Amino acid sequence: MSTIFDYLKEVTYDSIYDRPFNELDVLALTELTYLPFDRIVPQGDTTNIEVRLSDAAELVDRTTDFIVTDQHLQLVDDLASTKRFKNIKLLNYVNEYDPDIQKQFAAMTYRLTMDVYLVVFRGTDDTLIGWKEDFHMTYMDHVPAQRRAASYLQNVMKEFPKGRFLVAGHSKGGNLATYACTYLPNHLFERVDAIYSYDAPGLNRAIIETEGYQRTSPNILHFVPQGSIVGMMLEVPEPATIVKSRAFGGFVQHDAFTWMIEKDKFVTLDQTSPDSQQTDETLKQWVRETSADERKKFFDTFFGLFLDAGITSINDLRNLKNFSKIKEIFQNAQDLDPTEREMLERLAKQLLDTRVQAWKKWQTVPRILVQMATFFKRKNAVESSSALLLEHKD
């Protein structure tokens, strides 16, 4: 089946007027926002300085890492050569990182037509502070990136008082898009036509119950792959469109480049996989059974083990030169105060026990274990066959 790249080939010569902008077009620009435009698009909420997409593509840094992949580079090249995308304007780029308040935030605005804009919030990057901020959402109603998203969206909408807006994000970016729209004043929200959330975690119940969210909810288009893990976190009351992914496993399916497409729509399924549903049940039960203070201490301690060892990003962990840091991380764990170590071990065990209970309740084995069992069964069968052949030969 097709992916987003096949769709882009299909619409190469179609303008936005020939074929209306849809969920796949929004996804393409949402993924594009992961690229580093720091020295390409002027930074600020209301710069009003535009850069054409095809021009920006020529200046993009071609270095790949955990976040920016070869597929992202292929994406920017394909968009730059496609009629409906190449003349889109990029503006109001913001990329902020503040370890003191534990904030990772990035956003950019796309001018699609004269008065139609798409505001995209970037998902979590490779910084541990960014990942830590994500887990803060399990015990904080509002995190710094969410508040920043709300101010960014309001500033952009005020800059273009006659504009109509789409708002979108993948992963944490979808969470920020929903949050920012929830806290828009009514006179601004009236100009938001749709909110696109791609495999994004939900919000805390305190936010879900606000009038702002109840007003916003009907405008949310929530897409998750069948094995979704990230998109099942926290409270996600609106029904999701379940997209078929060609990838194996929930975390790999988080990569939207693996999502299947037919014509100009996602290939959809009726329900998420048992693994996804079990993980959803596990995380929600673990949150119910632990206090906000316990979760705060757990994640502060867990991420502290890495940060104290000088590991500040996922790319640091992937760097072979930093393998010596692993020993330091384990040493940091051994050096924890006995109370901290007991808390870390207890909550980790509780999370694991909750997952095991979910397996028992569903009377299913996680797919990864089934695959491993099948592999070893086949391996043993091949070895047995080889032994018989050798014996027959003798």
PLM regions and their residue ranges:
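Gly/Ala-rich beta-loop-alpha elbow adjacent to hydrolase catalytic centers
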Residues: A168-G173, A177
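Alpha/beta hydrolase fold serine-hydrolase catalytic domain that processes acyl esters and thioesters
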Residues: M1-L24, A28-Y117, F121-R164, P185-D394
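Short glycine-enriched nucleophile-adjacent loop
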Residues: A177-N186
